[in-house]
């Protein structure tokens, strides 16, 4: 007999002892679609990166220069909008559906205002950003254009992220997964026509003329922007048309409430600060890498893309951990919150250990997907093998942080990530890069991720993350 998250939440609210098989079933029901989504999304990103990579190392380096800045801006926004999903999970766990829909409505207002403001900010600084990051003058025009076009799509990217995370909080991991996969497929299709010029291709023995704009790096950015627009619109459409606890067609107020603002500050501000701390450290790391030459920049950027094959599975399980722990806390079941957190964390460590082995063995082949440059492949494979050793503990930190955030302990996650990233990774990278180049930077990364996993496991075991209690 299958059981849904909604049914399990009802059992928790009644104070019943939930069988372990039901717990495992719900964990798998939420985790598997998210993991498969992340795998498909990662595969599409591989294809996307390969399309740019085959233009040349300079094109890859242009995007790599601003990639950490896209992480910074989107990461801060994601930290804020994830606080709405955490509120929804806890309210649904407490069977406060009206409050959950109220949070959804307020998130729509937030996305419209903040998303447009962020887009304007990104476009405004795009002309100067590559220079601030120390990019070679030959890379700055493409890097600037990429960041400006990407920034313009932020309102849609926020919409897709917010509404998809809320659907997961309600126990539906399949729909947002399908939307995300479709978005990535569209990104690849758009890029196929926008990046490359009109050209002759042989398909099944037939010579065909394939139309293309030949916009290169700006074309890649536009493809991503258009795909985000479709994804955000679809996610909103699901919430408008589908019946269920989050159906916004049901009567309710659009008024901004004090409780929502308090929870946004309590949970969202530390999440945004955490993303800012991590991403700004990445910006500084990119600046360190920028001084190591075009080959190192390209190998670093493509290596990050290749590594995502490992850690994206962890982020899929993190989505499930956040929803499950959030609903358990809302139902006032600390015992179930602990059970969910350890089950999900163990799953994350196991899967990322396996993918880490695969990354170590097939590192050259992974790099070869993205570029034909032999020097970039050799250097990228070397640093990927260093990073593979840290994947299990990286998985522990990813999933444990999701569980803690579901309980409202975003401040604890922020502190651990801040200490780890700024105290360990940046310090080591600064010391090692002048002597060991990109290899030194990635050794610093691998060591830091291992220590971060240890810190999160210690906090998870101590249990103080549950003392934050349910939201207002």
Predicted regions and their residues:
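Residue-level hotspots within the lipid-embedded alpha helices of multi-pass solute transporters
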Residues: 38-39, 75, 115, 119, ...
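Helix-terminus/linker motif at the lipid-water interface of multi-pass membrane proteins
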Residues: 39-61, 130-137, 193-197, 207, ...
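Interfacial/gating helices of multi-pass transporter permease domains
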Residues: 51-71, 137-145, 217-222, 259-267, ...
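N-terminal transmembrane alpha-helices
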Residues: 18-50, 54-55, 68-87, 112-119, ...
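Short alpha-helical transmembrane segments in multi-pass integral membrane proteins
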Residues: 1-34, 88-155, 186, 202-268, ...
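Transmembrane helical elements of multi-pass membrane transporters/channels
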Residues: 29-48, 149, 160, 227-231, ...
């Amino acid at each position: 007999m299958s059981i849904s998250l909604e049914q399990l939440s009802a059992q928790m609210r009644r104070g019943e002892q939930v069988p372990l098989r039901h717990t495992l079933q719900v964990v798998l029901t939420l985790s598997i679609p998210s993991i498969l989504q992340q795998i498909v999304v990662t595969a599409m990103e591989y294809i996307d990166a390969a399309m740019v990579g085959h233009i040349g190392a300079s094109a890859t380096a242009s995007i790599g220069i601003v990639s950490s800045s896209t992480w910074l801006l989107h990461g801060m926004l994601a930290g804020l909008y994830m606080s709405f999903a955490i509120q929804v999970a806890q309210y649904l766990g407490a069977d406060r559906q009206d409050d959950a829909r109220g949070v959804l409505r307020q998130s729509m207002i937030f996305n419209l205002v903040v998303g447009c403001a962020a887009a304007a900010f990104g476009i405004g600084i795009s002309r100067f950003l590559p220079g601030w990051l120390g990019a070679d003058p030959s890379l700055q025009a493409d890097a600037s254009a990429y960041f400006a076009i990407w920034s313009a799509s932020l309102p849609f990217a926020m919409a897709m992220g917010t509404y998809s995370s809320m659907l997961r909080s309600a126990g539906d991991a399949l729909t947002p997964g399908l939307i995300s996969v479709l978005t990535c497929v569209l990104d690849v299709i758009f890029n196929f026509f926008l990046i490359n010029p009109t050209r002759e291709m042989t398909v099944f023995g037939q010579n065909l003329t394939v139309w293309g704009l030949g916009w290169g790096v700006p074309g890649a950015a536009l493809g991503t922007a258009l795909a985000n627009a479709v994804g955000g619109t679809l996610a909103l459409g699901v919430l408008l048309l589908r019946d269920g606890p989050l159906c916004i067609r049901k009567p309710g107020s659009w008024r901004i409430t004090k409780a929502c603002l308090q929870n946004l500050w309590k949970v969202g501000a530390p999440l945004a600060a955490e993303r800012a701390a991590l991403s700004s450290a990445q910006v500084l790391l990119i600046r360190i890498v920028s001084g190591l030459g075009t080959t190192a920049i390209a190998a670093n950027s493509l290596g990050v893309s290749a590594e995502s094959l490992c850690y994206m599975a962890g982020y899929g399980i993190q989505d499930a951990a956040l929803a499950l722990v959030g609903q358990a806390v809302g139902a006032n079941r600390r015992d179930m919150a602990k059970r969910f957190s350890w089950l999900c964390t163990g799953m994350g460590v196991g899967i990322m250990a396996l993918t880490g082995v695969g990354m170590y063995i097939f590192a050259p082949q992974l790099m070869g997907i993205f570029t034909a440059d032999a020097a970039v492949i050799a250097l990228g494979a070397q640093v990927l093998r260093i990073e593979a050793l840290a994947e299990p503990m990286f998985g522990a930190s990813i999933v444990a942080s999701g569980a803690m955030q579901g309980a409202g302990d975003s401040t604890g996650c922020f502190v651990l990530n801040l200490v780890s990233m700024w105290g360990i990774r940046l310090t080591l990278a600064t010391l090692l890069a002048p002597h060991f180049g990109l290899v030194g930077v990635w050794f610093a990364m691998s060591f830091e991720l291992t220590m971060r996993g240890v810190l999160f496991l210690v906090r998870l075991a101590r249990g103080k993350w549950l003392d934050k209690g349910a939201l207002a």
